[in-house]
Amino acid sequence: MDKIPMTRAGFTALDDELKTLKTVERPAVIRSIAEAREHGDLSENAEYHAAREKQSFIEGRIKELEAILSLAEVIDPAKLSGSIKFGATVTILDEETEEERTYQIVGEAEADIEAGLLNIKSPLARALIGKDEGDSIEVKTPGGERGYEVVSVRFV
């Protein structure tokens, strides 16, 4: 399988989530299941079924995180330079609204647009890859085509 590019911060966040699921969440849900079993008939025991559903979610997320972390390739953006690539922190200017936004281009597993972490596979990130300060790009969005200018590129 292909390696999954990831920043150190993204790797640490996912690893911390995995540890919490294994050491806190999993034992708590096991206790909840045991307590619900004590209430008798399992066929109509809502607490039991809710706890089992939560256990299923936790186990699924643990498997997902283990798979992601086993394929992670941690990339240190501070060691990079040049045009926009994975790990770059990019400030862009929306040519229509004159609004500046800053994003760091990261892997899928750590992307969070609200936190300024832009998925490398997103249309905006794909349009930015390979560009330099001062370049302009056009991006197709659900609301139509948008133009942006690259204001700055940093590797931190």
UniProtKB/Swiss-Prot annotation:
UniProt keyword terms in alphabetical order: Coiled coil, DNA-binding, Transcription, Transcription regulation
Entry keyword ATP-binding: no
Annotated GO MF terms: DNA binding; RNA polymerase binding
Source taxon at top rank: Bacteria
InterPro entries found in the cross-reference section: GreA/GreB_C_sf, TF_GreA/GreB_CS, Tscrpt_elong_fac_GreA, Tscrpt_elong_fac_GreA/B, Tscrpt_elong_fac_GreA/B_C, Tscrpt_elong_fac_GreA/B_fam, Tscrpt_elong_fac_GreA/B_N, Tscrpt_elong_fac_GreA/B_N_sf
Keyword check for 4Fe-4S: no
Pfam families reported in the protein's UniProt record: GreA_GreB (PF01272), GreA_GreB_N (PF03449)
Coiled-coil boundaries: 46-67
One annotated GO biological process: regulation of DNA-templated transcription elongation
Protein family per UniProt: Belongs to the GreA/GreB family.
Role, per record: Necessary for efficient RNA polymerase transcription elongation past template-encoded arresting sites. The arresting sites in DNA have the property of trapping a certain fraction of elongating RNA polymerases that pass through, resulting in locked ternary complexes. Cleavage of the nascent transcript by cleavage factors such as GreA or GreB allows the resumption of elongation from the new 3'terminus. GreA releases sequences of 2 to 3 nucleotides.
Protein known as: Transcription elongation factor GreA
Gene behind the chain: greA
